[in-house]
A protein has these predicted regions:
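Glycine-rich phosphate-binding loop used to anchor ATP phosphates in small-molecule kinases
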Residues: 1-27
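Conserved nucleotide-binding/hydrolysis micro-motifs of P-loop NTPases
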Residues: 4-5, 30-35, 92-94
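Charged, alpha-helix-enriched surfaces in structured cytosolic catalytic cores
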Residues: 8, 12, 31, 35, ...
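A contiguous binding-surface segment within folded domains or other stable secondary-structure elements
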Residues: 18, 25-45
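Conserved GTP-binding G-domain of TRAFAC-class P-loop NTPases and closely related GTPase folds
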Residues: 38-179
C-alpha cells in the first residue's frame, strides 16, 4: 500500500517488486475534492465518538495529494511497471463496497486519468445539485468535533478547517449559479 507521491523512490520500489516477480495493481479511489476534504473531518468526528485520538489532514496536504499521484501512475504505466490500474468510486454509503469504474484494458474510458476526472466531475455535480445535504454534513461534523474534541488546539484547527471548507463550498456554489 502506497500513496504514490514520492517520485523516483516509488518507481525504484516498483522496479524491485517487478524484478522479484510481483504483480503490481494500482487501485485509485476517484473522489471529488470537496467530498474528500469533508470525509477527513467526518472520519475525525467518528474517531472522537469512538473515543480514539483522531488524525487530521490539512487542506494544503489534500491539495498537494489530490492530483499528485496521477503523473506517477502514468509514469509507472509507461514504464510497464504496473499490471493493473483500477479506478473506483465510493459505494452509496459506508456499508456498500466501492464501485469499479475503470479497469486497464477494458473500460468505457480512454485511460485511468479520464476515468478519475470524469468521476470526480460527476460527484461535484451531485454535490452542487444538493448543497443542503453537504452543508448539513459539515454542520454534523462541526457539532461532534466541538463537543468531543480531545484538545483545544486540534479542535480549533478542525473547526477552522470546517469553516474554510464551508466557505469554499459556498463560493463554488456561487460560481455555479447562472447570472440573472
Amino acid at each position: 500500500e502506497n500513496t504514490l507521491d514520492k517520485g523516483e523512490s516509488d518507481i525504484e520500489l516498483a522496479r524491485k517488486l517487478k524484478d522479484n516477480g510481483y504483480r503490481i495493481s494500482i487501485n485509485i479511489m476517484a473522489t471529488d475534492l470537496f467530498e474528500s476534504r469533508l470525509s477527513c473531518f467526518e472520519r475525525e468526528a467518528a474517531m472522537l465518538l469512538a473515543g480514539l485520538t483522531p488524525r487530521g489532514c490539512s487542506k494544503e496536504t489534500q491539495l498537494r495529494m489530490y492530483n499528485g499521484f496521477m503523473k506517477e501512475i502514468e509514469q509507472l504505466d509507461t514504464l510497464g511497471l504496473c499490471d493493473d490500474i483500477n479506478v473506483f468510486v465510493r459505494g452509496e454509503n459506508i456499508n456498500r463496497p466501492p464501485v469499479l469504474k475503470y479497469s486497464k484494458g477494458s473500460s468505457e474510458y480512454l485511460n485511468f486519468k479520464s476515468a478519475v476526472v470524469t468521476e470526480r466531475n460527476r460527484q461535484r455535480e451531485a454535490l452542487l445539485n444538493e448543497p443542503d445535504k453537504y452543508l448539513l454534513r459539515i454542520g454534523k461534523a462541526r457539532d461532534i468535533i466541538s463537543e468531543y474534541g480531545v484538545n483545544e488546539t486540534l479542535t480549533r484547527n478542525s473547526l477552522t478547517g470546517l469553516k474554510e471548507l464551508q466557505s469554499d463550498f459556498i463560493q463554488e456554489l456561487d460560481k455555479d449559479e447562472p447570472e440573472q
